[in-house]
Amino acid sequence: MGWPWEFLTLTDEEKHQRRLSLEHYAYIAHLSAFAPALLFVLLRLINRVRRSRSSGYQQVPGSPTIKATQQRWISRVMGKGPMIKWWLGEDVWFMGSHWGQRDEWVLGIVWTAWLLALSIHGTGKDYLHLTKRLGIVATSQMPIQYLLALKAINPFAFVLRSSHEHINRYHRVLGRIIYFLLTLHAILYNVFFIESGIWFKRFFAPIVFAGVAGFIVMHALNGTAMARVRQQSYRVFFIVHLLSAFAIPPLIYYHAPSSRFYIGEAIGVFVLDLAVRKMITITAPAVVEAIPGTSLVKVSATMPSHKIATYAARPGSHIYLNVPPASRPGTGQFSAPYLVFEFLYNPFTVASTNQETGELTFVARTRTGPMTNRLHNLSSSTNDGASAEKVELNIEGPYGTIGKTFNDLITSGINRVLIVAGGVGASFAIPLYHAVNAENSIAHVQLIWAIRSAGDATWASSTPTGKSILDDDQVQLFLTGDMGVADDSDNAAGVEMNDMAQQTTHPAVRNNKRPDLQKIVDDTFRKSQQENVAIMVCGPTEMVRELRKSVTPWVMKGRNVWWHNESFGW
């Protein structure tokens, strides 16, 4: 079968019909992007109705045989749901590199096929129709792409009861699909120009070159969005990403007038989100303290009462931190050390809140980046917060999935909770540990915390009850030694699990070795043969992989697991 498309000469009426067809298929592509979220809502409503009917009183019972058959069929289907969900949530590894999760690949392949079908259907033999269709279908996805990236007003996060850091996975998937379609669009147009002998004439025409410039910017955006680049310098990725987000829309707006509706949508939601984020950001006075004997700093910021109440109601949430002009380094407003903080908004998990004093506390490990280094430079070695000098910090939040689903965790009948943390991942785990114990006193809650040295736990020694968390029988600390917890690399969020020699530590610390996650998980499930189990983790990649691998056999046996991995991998 040969190439079906040809260079056709169309009449004005045929060109008009082609334009109508382009707009029609672009609208379909644009609106259909909301279908997955709507389908999710529909399934959730169906499940809610099914549960309410099954728990309701039936005045006239149906046939026992038919009823039993229906219940067996429904039970089988519903029983496979958690297994399928777990399978889709598994990571994909290829040649030692992480390639996202299975659900990203499934959705990405399906969505690519759908958009390619919309790009091809109805084009006939018209080569330029196919070329233009690829471009406008790709552009119709840009508002969705921007929506998926929003932090404060992300509608997909609202519908899916998630948070932007999880939705951002699909932002990356859709970005690659758009890039793929626009690459095909550019290749086909270049072939047309070359075959028609007008490449030099058309390539540098303003309307065409605007598209070329936009494509170059998109190359830079996708290049810096690669995982290796983000790990080497998140700062470069973020700055290029932000500048590209502003540069690409006006270039496409000029290049393709038919796409202006979608470009306007994209810019509108992006600017609106920035405005909302600006309004919810608090400039708070804060005390920054260095924790002696560690590379940790503890930040205690004084927040307005309404804000601190919001954070207190959402345990395990995180904030975005920005250093305002008053607290920045540099000799002037145009110096590089000063300007770099215009682009830095780093995530930190809220370790604790105190509604009486209005204090919000988070902990950071000093690394090679400018943000944690600036916090270290601002820190005071004294532990006397009253005498320490206060600095201004911009705090935006709260964010995080767990804050939205915490009520489900409490009310869903879960009887056993296992929380695993590595290093400063305990800033996520400890507030949840206290909150679950406070809200669900009958649940058995266990906290596993792996740290490099006992000094790394000093910031968490106090609890809302006044009793040290280190004296809690349900909290197990594992000291991994100097080689245990993360170094200064970006991947090292908590602990690299190696054995260490015995040493004298706090009386509550009984484990001078790496945690045996397989045994811990097996014991958790064996002690609760019929109970629902919640497992939450915040730590380095290797810890999360080992924990999930240990849980997988139990999920495949049909155990109901409420799983949450708190990570900042975007």
Language-model region placement:
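Classical protein tyrosine phosphatase
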Residues: S55-P61, G135-T139, N168, R172-H185, ...
